[in-house]
Design a protein with these regions (language model features):
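N-terminal carbohydrate-binding accessory modules
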Residues: 20-35, 50
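Acidic/aromatic-lined carbohydrate-recognition and catalytic surfaces
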Residues: 69-187, 196-222
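Bacterial N-terminal signal peptides that target proteins for export
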Residues: 1-6
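Beta-strand-rich ligand-recognition modules
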Residues: 809-813, 826-844, 858, 862, ...
Length: 946
């Protein structure tokens, strides 16, 4: 019996393991495979338990694997009402097997503790007071009597009397700590300057006008964790690491530039603190100034990152949870002193993963340079680079996505945004939002459920399934990336510096992937030179790009030289570094290294500047390298792209991500972001790929074969993509006899019409009440049909697809009439009647009306938040729609190329974008079958079998 029982257990385990293959999870999407997709779920403190549970049920039905419980704001945040509502959320998460994240602020920005940060724990700024002393003069003072005293330093002025000589600095701080100081300048005939350093409370934040916690002082961070984090653990600790996944921070700022941990950072780095303090607030003479100021900026960022974000993450780690979130990244705020201490990467390296926010219309289908907040296009690469170069678990990187885009956000747009994130390596998507108050709210829609008044809710499941399947294959395993781009946000604080957005885009257009690699990560021992590769965690970079920067650290450029001499490929563009950002090293030291790499007289050009003895090559390209120029240089150096196009037109909108998955197989994600409807036929070439290419269809959950050829150590394959259709290609060990992938040339064995079902109960979407503040632009339409399927068409090996055509535009251009349009600040600060403005746009043929902040003035990010509300009549039906600043109102929307399908009452999948088909094989039964297609009108509904 014992032997039989043991054997039986082994057999059951084997069956379970077979059932839990990557392919099985991809097809079936169990809840655990969905945990990288999950929305913000808002809590205000005025919702009933019944309301919260009802909307959480919709979160689960929508195919999510997680949600973030966010105070928006909760009227009792950190009070009993807050914990009561979190308890309701936690019970629902357990019931639905969802992971739950906890928002760490009453609204945003994080680390303001609902505006209740005590002065003693608030962020600090360094203040300097200088006293000029003539030769032989004496300083008398007692600066340490001030509780905010930091340091007392003296230094000799240069001959011009404008700057302090770095090697003359004298530390008078120990004297000051003992009491009154009386100090006479040396008898050298030179003027001296005595500098008193102290701190003051940092200004209130730009968002919210609140004080924030000092992230550079351990006692302040300890108070913050004690006040915000520990009470949650005290109540819900048993769920930590199980149902509760961790905490989410939102848009913290870095108003402070000094804290009690700063000097420890200087000491750990072996950097003298005195010249750095002086350079930060005053001026050092000669080359020491940029180097010392840079070192202060780096130490500041490191201190804030280690103390605040490292402190939070370590607290979370000890309780088996994670710390995630995002800063403000758009418009280069990721290198802004007040938003991320000058370099977001140095702060967020201490979090559990990289993260960004993508909101308003920062991303627009078919556009890279948007009017709002540019540049934004490469912020996803910023997030994934943090995860890649700092070795975050499974290369997870997150994005809070779609916030304030407006209720007229379409599902094809959502897919397009998701493809952009995923191809850049961002694989945890947090949609914004499920709001229990909706539709009686205007707070940054879209609301995907909208209180039951959003007919497109069924499409959310289609989108969630799609992006969850992408994340399943594109997280874990190893990232395959040929290029590293050296990066330092703080180098921009002390001289000319070009951030890497344009270069990254050019590389992606040439089908080369890259990671942004901070100077300090490149310099440290974790990044190793192995022949012609840079090895970092799982990364194997074959080429290194040096940024167009006026200054660079000596250690970074010295390692660039070592990489070149070991056989690596080095690319500069625009300008080569001239200044040293390392104290004690000079421009002459930088010049010697630069000349070793690029030669003494490097000029921008196409050919290599130098070739090393071990095959290393250096290039110096134009200020804005084209994809063609980058591809030529890298190709000449023997660095292959992620993917080559042998035939077919990308239009500059086809990009690729390559990984090795958890089972050791190569995976390509080919993101086709062309927005027209034209199908494109490609022949691709995958360098160094091994195995049989299979297309894993993330939209339909099926695996198919494509024509392919083995070419030496590479693989070529043919792939046709519809407009906006992207593809996962996985290289299997052997030919598994997969069915052929369908194209427009494929012909079905049989086509069965699906007839309207006259006996079906009509489905009518509820109409939003008159007091609704956010109204869907879609009225909704449901097709209910019936189809009879002969048994022989369901034979083994046959595939059956539900196929349909979309009906197109709603309404007639002549039936739309604007009744009233109002633009008003939601805090009552002002309003304007803009009926005439909107009416004129509509008469001119426009169907999209932007919410314009210029009408009332002010910046939508920091001023009064305003809402545009339009009441209109279309084809005899009245409706009201609204959108906040930066979003758009769509009147008379077109039917989206999207559908959700049910067969015999069971959810069967759906599609977003072409091709308009769903694999329904396993849902069909011989004989009569019912079919439901929503939420847009369809025609020519049919079942095609292959």
């Amino acid at each position: 019996m014992i032997r039989f029982g043991f054997a039986g257990c082994v057999m059951m385990m084997a069956v379970a393991l077979r059932a839990d293959t990557l392919e099985n999870r991809f097809r079936e999407l169990p809840r655990a495979a969905r945990c990288n997709t999950g929305p913000l779920f808002w809590l205000h403190g005025d919702e009933t338990p019944e309301r919260l549970n009802a909307v959480l049920d919709k979160v689960a039905e929508g195919g999510n694997g997680a949600f973030t419980a966010e105070s928006r704001p909760h009227k009792e945040w950190l009070g009993e009402g807050w914990y009561r509502d979190l308890g309701i959320c936690l019970d629902a998460a357990k019931r639905h097997d969802l992971k739950m994240w906890i928002f760490d602020e009453d609204w945003w920005p994080s680390q303001t503790v609902a505006g209740k940060v005590p002065q003693q724990y608030a962020a600090k700024r360094l203040k300097g007071q200088a006293l000029l002393l003539k030769p032989g003069a004496r300083y008398d003072g007692n600066p340490a009597k001030d509780a905010a005293f930091v340091a007392l330093v003296a230094g000799r002025l240069d001959k011009e009397g404008q700057a302090v000589v770095a090697d003359s600095l004298v530390d008078l701080t120990p004297l000051a700590r003992k009491g009154p100081v009386s100090w006479r300048t040396p008898a050298d005939g030179e003027a001296w300057q005595v500098m008193v350093f102290s701190w003051v409370t940092a200004p209130r934040l730009k968002q919210g006008n609140r004080l924030s916690v000092d992230g550079m002082s351990r006692d302040c961070v300890a108070w913050f964790i004690r006040t915000v984090y520990e009470p949650h653990y005290a109540r819900f600790g048993q769920a930590f690491g199980k149902t509760i996944a961790g905490y989410f921070y939102d848009e913290p700022e870095t108003a402070g530039d000094w804290g009690t941990e700063l000097d420890a950072t200087f000491k750990a780095r072996g950097v003298a603190w005195m010249p750095c303090y002086v350079a930060w607030l005053f001026t050092l003479a000669g080359e020491a100034q940029p180097a010392a100021k840079y070192q202060y900026a780096e130490a500041r960022a490191e201190t804030w990152g280690r103390t605040m974000f490292g402190g939070i993450t370590e607290w979370c780690r000890r309780r088996d949870v994670l710390s995630i979130g995002h800063f403000m990244e758009h418009n280069r705020l990721y290198v802004h002193n007040d938003y991320c201490a000058g370099d977001m990467m140095l702060l967020q390296k201490y979090s559990s993963m990289g993260g960004i926010d993508a909101v308003f219309d920062q991303f627009v289908m078919g556009q890279r340079d948007t009017r709002r907040d540019a540049p934004c296009w490469q912020t996803p690469k910023l997030a994934s680079s943090i995860s890649h170069v700092y070795g975050k678990a499974d290369d997870l990187a997150m994005c809070e996505i779609f916030g304030a885009r407006g209720q007229d956000l379409t599902y094809p747009e959502m897919k397009w945004w998701a493809d952009r994130m995923q191809v850049c390596g961002v694989n945890v998507l947090i949609p914004h939002s499920f709001n229990p108050r909706a539709p009686h709210d205007t707070d940054c829609p879209p609301y995907f459920y909208n209180g039951g008044f959003e007919p497109r809710l069924a499409l959310y499941r289609v989108w969630a399934d799609y992006t969850s399947r992408l994340s399943l294959l594109l997280a874990g395993g190893r990232h395959v990336c040929p290029v590293a781009v050296l990066f330092s946000g703080n180098a921009r604080q002390v001289g000319a510096y070009t951030t890497p957005e344009d270069l990254t885009s050019a590389l992606q257009d040439a089908l080369y992937d890259c990671d942004w690699l901070p100077f300090e990560r490149f310099e440290d021992g974790v990044t190793k030179i192995k022949g012609n590769e840079l090895r970092l965690h799982g990364e194997r970079y074959r080429a290194l790009v040096v940024p167009p920067a006026e200054g660079i650290t000596f250690a970074a450029l010295e390692k660039v030289r070592a990489f070149f001499e070991a056989g690596g490929t080095v690319i500069g563009y625009g300008r080569l570094p001239e200044r040293s950002l390392t104290l004690g090293k000079t421009a002459a030291d930088i010049a010697r290294l630069r000349e070793t790499i690029w030669g003494a007289d490097a000029r921008p050009g196409k050919s290599a500047c130098r070739t090393g003895r071990r095959g290393g090559r250096s290039y110096f390209l134009a200020e804005q390298p084209t994809p063609e120029a980058l591809a030529a240089a890298l190709g000449e150096a023997g660095v292959p792209p992620v993917l080559r196009v042998l035939s077919g037109e990308t239009g500059g909108w086809v990009h690729a991500l390559r990984r090795v998955d958890r089972e050791g197989r190569d995976v390509l994600f080919i993101a086709n972001q062309n927005t027209n409807d034209a199908a494109r036929a490609f022949t691709f070439h995958a360098p160094d790929a091994a195995g049989v290419p299979e297309v894993w269809d993330a939209m339909r959950g099926e695996v198919t074969a494509v024509p392919w050829r083995k070419e030496a150590d590479d693989v070529s394959f043919d792939l046709t993509l519809e407009g906006g259709e992207s593809a996962l290609v996985r290289f299997a060990k052997r030919d598994a006899g997969r069915p052929a992938r369908l194209t427009s040339a494929s012909r079905p064995v049989a086509t069965l019409p699906v007839f309207p079902d006259a006996s079906a109960d009509p489905v009518v979407y509820p109409v939003a009440p008159d007091n609704a503040l956010t109204v869907s632009p879609v009225t909704g339409s449901v097709f209910q049909g019936v189809v009879t399927v002969p048994p022989e068409l369901l034979a083994d090996g046959r595939r059956a697809y539900l196929v349909c055509d979309l009906e197109g535009r709603h309404g007639s251009p002549d039936t739309l009439r604007i009744l009233k349009a109002t633009y008003a600040a939601i805090d009552g600060a002002g309003s304007a009647d803009v009926t005439r403005f909107v009416s004129e746009r509509v008469r001119g043929g426009a169907r999209v009306v932007p919410a314009l902040p210029s009408i009332l003035g002010g910046d939508p990010a920091y001023g009064h938040v305003k809402t545009l509300t339009v009441e209109y009549e279309d084809d005899g039906k009245r409706a009201t729609v609204s959108a906040r600043d930066g979003a758009r109102i769509t009147l008379r929307p077109q039917a989206e190329t999207a559908a959700a399908v049910r067969v015999n009452g069971a959810y069967a999948g759906g599609f977003i974008g072409n091709p308009c088909r769903v694999n329904i094989t396993r849902h069909l039964q011989p004989g009569s079958n019912t079919v439901r297609v929503e939420p847009f009108g369809v025609q020519n509904v049919r079942v095609e079998t292959y």
